[in-house]
Amino acid sequence: MRKRWILAILALVLLLVAGVAAAGYVVWQKRHPGTIRGSSSTEFVATEEPGVATRPERQVQKIPWPTYGYDEQRSRFAPGIDLRPPFDVAWQRGTGSLLEFPPVVAYWRVYVGANDGRFIALEAETGHLSWKKEFGRCIASSPTVSRGVVYQPLMDPFPCAQHKLNAPGYVVALDAHTGEELWRFQAGVVETSPLVVGNLLYFGSWDTKMYAVDVKTHKAVWTFPTGDALKAGPAYAHGTLYFASYDDKVYAVDALTGKLRWSASGTANFYATPTLAYGRVFIGNTDGRVYAFGEQSGHLLWAKATGGYVYSSAAVWQKTVYVGSYSKRFYALDAGSGDVRWSFDAGAPISGAPTVLDGIVYFSTLGEKTFGLDARNGKKLWEFGDGKYSPVVADEQHVYLAGYKKLYGLLPRGG
């Protein structure tokens, strides 16, 4: 009998040890999440290539770079722009404060907001000041342009570090030609780069809500609550709005009604803006992984560990996902499987998003350098001694580079 009791106690101890080990493994896995390999045989639309559904040429000439990430899908790939390095600086303009997000380009002007609340419109050809506004509120997002109006989010009064979660924020609507304020919408602190689709202006707020505001009535059509602050912009495709929250979730909602279609979880915060291509949602997470979810289902298709936080939003081109990591490496990942096609040691953490132009992928590091790599093989083609976050946008004549406190207009050498 005693022997049976001893065996029973030993079995119980083993079960407890196994349970503790299993729980410990789950905790370890959450803190050190690994790679989950995917396949292009599941929810992969090869024909959904970035840049295929291009805007009319006349519209592109007037508004060559209308929003953060170039298009509604935030692909960060601009078709038809064939500007290649080496570049010469045609002009440069000091902003007096940090440029955390890149400009947009429209109506032959470049529009950008600096961290201290200064918003400027520069002549694209010369860099001369067209108009400026002083908001006195922190700006940590790109504007968006639609039908003659520039929409810029505002945070709490400068400096940015003193923000409170319940502080007010705004999105202001400015006449793109004169800078006149047309109207503003109050929400919580707004850090997300907005998006206009049709008559609806979409943006998220630290008040935990995603907003859809009618640009004609200036009223909210719907709001969608999440479990934490929204700090990254939304993306749009096929009638669905995709966005992420600091509640560790990605959401897909009906763009007209705000009705939830699906939500999916990561193991830490999502700061990055989603990128949509090939029927998938690509997004980085502070757990150090890049995720691919199905646009229609929300199913996890792959997750790639990078060795450091992924604040960077992704660019997509030629069935490849381009993204930087705090591990100081820049990655080109197979969009189908998540496998590494190539990687590049950038020498410093990467926080901002890349851009692909004419087969070259551009990105900056926190070491204040900007690189241009051959997007096919990762070979370094160009380097510039400024830039910190999301550096490059373009039109048919210039590449515009957001440095730490300067904006540059670049021209191809000899062009």
Q: How would you name each of these model-derived features?
A:
Residues M1-L16:
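N-terminal Sec-pathway targeting helices
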Residues I9, A23-G24:
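Intrinsically disordered, low-structural-confidence terminal and linker regions
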Residues V17-A22:
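Alpha-helical transmembrane segments
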Residues G24-F101, H128-F135, Y170-D175, E180-Q186, ...:
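Aromatic (tryptophan-biased) beta-strands that constitute blades/sheets of beta-rich domains
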Residues Y25-K30, Q59-Y70, G96-R118, R137-V171, ...:
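Repeat-blade elements of multi-bladed beta-propeller folds
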Residues S75-P79, D116, E123:
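Short, glycine/acidic-enriched capping/hinge loops at junctions between secondary-structure elements
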Residues G113, E125, K216, A244, ...:
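Glycine-rich phosphate/oxyanion-binding loops and their immediately adjacent helices
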